[in-house]
């Protein structure tokens, strides 16, 4: 088992090698924002209870949350749990794109997280020595299917706690103002025709086709990870595999076509994308500046609700078409990269407190309603409340109609370093300072080199 000192040394060496930094000039700023987020969330976190309810745990919970967009909801839910049970719950939220960095740093401390998450098999490989075996726990027994369990041999080391979808969030009202409906978009060619027509009439219409494809650390994951999933998925489908140490790049021309469509038909010049943020993209969509916004079901509460400009009737989500496969029967990109893991190095009391908190979140009225209504989650547990999320409903409707969801194969990407290399190449390509060949090199050669490093570790 690795020691705290070993983790500290690993953090230092990985950061020195640039393995955990954001791409381009964003590394220092995103690392700084991660620290600020951690400090702010810690300060806002646990609350002492006045009248504890029944609980078997005498310990405390420290949850290192992956999702900044759900921070407020997690803080509120933690407070409710503490008020009901008397068990202190601290929620710390890492800044966007900085989870692994923050996790490495926090796990090196004496008061390390008791609850953290990994993104799938690749993430588990890095952290399995710290993961408590969840086999036989109450939360494991509440799963609707073992397919949501992350296993290493006979041990259940992670549990998927949310199923999500991503695609093209679409403002139906603006689309109709441009003379189209969602029924007009069933393929890449359809999407290209609509987007380029909107661009040609941009001054007349008063809006663009796509929000800015921001490539700073708060936004580039949408393209170096989520958009990159599409060519990986279709290559895996063609080759009949679910993982590889040597991606071929069969569909990288299609990746180029969709990325070109985004950056050449958006709210800003492609050369400006290096400095554009996730907030920029969201605000453009909120302000009716664009029809399409590539993002996921987790964005629902940022767009709909009190003080928000949209209702469910205004929005839907379309598949990300790249011109491959049976597009008429393609669904949204649906899956999970969110697996809860319990720190087995925590005290027995803290482990038990954490297990109780996890089970309460997915089984109690307060927990399940908060996860469905406040966070917009679909959770794979027996007591799940149906989510009001319009994007979740879109996924269900497509699946019921026989459309095939695109699997989340990005959990097989070899490393964060690989993602950052692809992100840097995409940013340079958009700015005109790099070529698409550089993207292909980062994608294919970078994959092979990172996979080799993993094999040698």
Model-predicted segments: where are they?
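Conserved N-terminal structural module of periplasmic/extracytoplasmic solute-binding proteins
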Residues: 8-9, 24-123, 139, 274, ...
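Extracytoplasmic/periplasmic solute-binding protein
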Residues: 50, 157-159, 166, 192-244, ...
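Hinge/lid segment of periplasmic solute-binding proteins
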Residues: 50-55, 119-167, 222, 226, ...
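Extracytoplasmic "Venus flytrap"/periplasmic binding protein-like
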Residues: 80-145, 157, 173-179, 186, ...
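Extracytoplasmic/periplasmic substrate-recognition and gating elements
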Residues: 84, 178, 267, 307-373
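A structural signal for short loop-to-beta-strand junctions that line the ligand-binding cleft
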Residues: 106, 113-114, 140-175, 206-208, ...
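Conserved C-terminal helix/tail region of periplasmic/extracytoplasmic solute-binding proteins
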Residues: 176, 200, 366-368, 383-387, ...
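Glycine-centered hinge/linker elements that transmit conformational signals in sensory
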Residues: 195-196, 241-275
